[in-house]
Amino acid sequence: MASSSHPLIKFLVLSVVSFCIGTLHGMLQVMPPIRHWLDTIGSPYGGPGHMIDPLAHAHMNLVGGVVLLAMGVTYYLLPILSGRAIRSRRLTNATFWLTALGAYGFYFTQMGFGIAEGLALHSAPETIAPLHHYYGPTVALCGTVMAAGFFCYLVNIALTLLSRPVPRAVVLSVREAPKSALR
């Protein structure tokens, strides 16, 4: 893992970025003026505020932070622990990009619609319904992309576990295993 071009480093980097965004989001949403505004628009029990807190905040931390980290760690450790090469580098890359795009799309969809509908709730409530018309398809698209990333991950792990073990010489050390184990 000495090289920054390691195929799994992107999982770690985006996990850290996601935790930073989620932490900043969490700190901002408890500041009294922001918390008051969120409470007036329905957070955390419904309404536009619910999109910002807890939906956007939780998904950034859980999917962007924890899930991407867990996926990267699994891809790193599985060859070492099982003696099997990760079945597909393409599926590994698809796992990362689909999960990342889905999670960030979901986050920004929740934030964008939450803020827009929250502002409209106080100034022009009649504009919420036409705006909300686009919310369902947008969040469904992002969720589907995220789910496709999860599916690629599960398929790749299953194919790896069902494959034949590689000779132990291929999995020499913790440092070299992922490089030699990812095709």
Regions from the language model: what does each represent?
Residues 1-183:
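Hydrophobic alpha-helical transmembrane segments of multi-pass integral membrane proteins
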